[in-house]
Structures are given as structure tokens and as C-alpha cells.
Regions:
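Outer-membrane beta-barrel transmembrane strands
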Residues: 6-15, 19-21, 58, 114-129, ...
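Context-gated lysine
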Residues: 20, 24, 44, 75, ...
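Gram-negative outer-membrane beta-barrel transporters
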Residues: 2-93
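C-terminal beta-signal and adjacent terminal beta-strands/loops
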Residues: 76, 84-102, 121, 128-199
Length: 199
């Protein structure tokens, strides 16, 4: 993976946006469909990647959706929901496995031939503004935020391991090579922020 080889890439897509900037309930939604593909250009078989065929780059996310809805309670309180979702990151699944001294070694032929589960998350925030005080030289506000409101276990990466015991419904069904998924921030996370601006 650290070798530098000759190749080419292409990227294309389209973005749609919907906004409501005014009113007690306001917000916006963005949807993007895009592709990011790579292809090696090597005549030597050993230097080819994916047999010189197009394959998704590590940054290929065909579908990305982001949205925010704000509820303006009064001039002091604002509640917001922010949702984000996108296609899973491409990764490479072994095409086969061979045994070498009791160790199962994966064989990779196709590059980025599978994807992690889709990523999505809902965040909530409550912003409390303070009115101007003649005894203070600044104006401040508090923001209370809860990230990952519904405890989504978003995959960060996928790793291979030697399978022991019964075979379940993992990717390598019937193979001695198993997989395990690494997730981060699996539960809601609370953040408190104080912002201030000097007059």
C-alpha cells in the first residue's frame, strides 16, 4: 500500500440543497451524490491494482445527506437537531484464503470491493443566550450538545482475525478467517460550550 504507482482518477457528482432561513422553525438540508474512482496504468502484472480496472477510492461516498432543523423558542432559547448520513467507506475483502503453517493468510485480488455499514448520526443542541448587561463588557451564551442521540454504533474500520469455533453469518461465511468491526463513540456524548464576544 505504500508503493507509488502510475494511475489516474476521476470524480463527479451533483448536489441539491433546500433551505428555510426564516421563521420559528428554520433549517436546511443538503444531499450529494458523487463518485471518486481510481485506476492504475501499469503493463507489468505485478504492478497492477485491481487488474487496471476502475475501483472506488477510499474517499468514495456515493450518498451524503446533512440536515439541520432549528426551533426558535424565544430570543433566549434555540433548540436544534442535526442529522448526518453517508455511504460506508470502501474497504477490501479477501477473495480467498490459504493456510501457511497453521496461519490463514488472506489473498486480495480486487481493491475496495466492499463497504462498511452506512454512517448516520443525530445530534441535539440547546443554545441559551443572555441579554445585554450594562455591568458586563461582553455578551455570552451557553450551548448544551448531545452527540449521537440514539447510540448508533458507526463502523470505523474492519479487521481480520483467526476464527475459532462455530461459523456465524460474518463476511467470510464458511472460512477460517473471521472479521471484527471497530466502532467509536457508541453512546451519546454530552458537550457544554460557553461562547462570549466583547462589545
Amino acid at each position: 500500500e505504500r508503493d507509488v504507482i502510475q494511475g489516474e482518477g476521476q470524480a463527479y457528482g451533483v448536489e441539491l440543497s433546500l433551505r428555510k432561513p426564516r421563521g420559528k422553525v428554520n433549517g436546511w438540508f443538503n444531499y450529494t451524490w458523487s463518485r471518486s474512482l481510481l485506476r492504475s496504468q501499469n503493463e507489468k502484472l505485478a504492478d497492477r491494482v485491481n487488474n487496471n480496472q476502475w475501483y472506488p477510492s477510499d474517499f468514495d461516498r456515493p450518498h451524503v445527506l446533512n440536515g439541520t432543523v432549528n426551533f426558535e423558542g424565544d430570543k433566549y432559547n434555540t433548540w436544534s437537531f442535526n442529522f448526518t448520513a453517508q455511504s460506508g467507506r470502501p474497504f477490501t475483502v479477501a477473495n480467498s484464503v490459504f493456510a501457511l503453517e497453521d496461519i490463514n493468510v488472506p489473498i486480495f485480488i480486487e481493491r475496495n470491493n466492499a463497504r462498511l455499514r452506512p454512517y448516520h448520526r443525530l445530534d441535539f443542541s440547546w443554545k441559551i443566550k443572555y441579554g445585554r448587561n450594562p455591568n458586563r463588557k461582553w455578551v455570552g451564551d451557553w450551548t448544551f450538545t448531545i452527540y449521537n442521540l440514539y447510540s448508533r454504533r458507526n463502523p470505523f474500520n474492519l479487521y481480520y482475525s483467526q476464527r475459532q469455533g462455530a461459523v456465524d453469518s460474518e463476511i467470510f461465511l464458511g472460512s477460517p478467517l473471521g472479521t471484527y468491526e471497530l466502532s467509536v463513540m457508541n453512546s451519546p456524548l454530552l458537550a457544554i460550550t460557553y461562547n462570549f464576544v466583547f462589545d
